[in-house]
């Protein structure tokens, strides 16, 4: 009887139990970590990339950039960064056109959390939701704007020193080359390391000094804080001037389907208005 019962368990109606997957050993798990990081979507914008509403989010970002998000005290991003993302070089407001959405998202969140010191920006973005930030970040990441005029004083004698710090570093004082993180000619290493080529001298000097005195502390492992604190004033001026003299990168033309109303935003439009191109 017992033999018949066991035979019935091996019948098609009772297939034998399947073996489960073999457990992953610890050393195998460590090998999978780099692969996991490569395929992991960038924080903050993964939803935007996957839900099929990218065009709508960019259009929302364009609206917030022009008018704010509707909360009391909310100011349009274009008031300072301009609708073309060119910023205001004369007063050190950075260009954000063409920066990666991941980086812009991270920096706005940093202002909200207090890891990036900016009293004015903190008032502007304090009521921004993550969806608002995602939309604005996506919008400005698609904008392409030629370099604006930087009225800062240019000292030709500083250029060789700035180039040396940028490209070779000052290893005798444990100061690495800037291009190791910010890319060849300051073009950035997307998505996490921003381009700094073509930023204004005033802005770059402000940020290096902000890292040096730990007003800004959103750098991974305190890397920029450690570097900035070792630079002398003349070296800060030199490296800021060098990168300000370079041309900002263009990561490609705006895909038509991602550009609301197919706008081309040009630096002459500093009054927050757009110009349609044919």
What are the language-model segments listed below?
Residues 257-272:
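A short, charged, Gly/Pro-tolerant segment at domain boundaries
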Residues 62-78, 101, 167-179, 194-206, ...:
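Sequence context surrounding c-type heme c attachment/ligation sites in exported
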Residues 79, 88-95, 110-153, 190-195, ...:
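Axial heme c-ligation environment in periplasmic c-type cytochrome domains
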Residues 56-114:
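The feature marks the first
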Residues 1-25:
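N-terminal secretory signal peptides that target proteins for export/translocation
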Residues 29-40:
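Bacterial N-terminal signal peptides
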Residues 46-73, 142-171, 269-278:
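Electrostatic cytochrome c docking/interface patches
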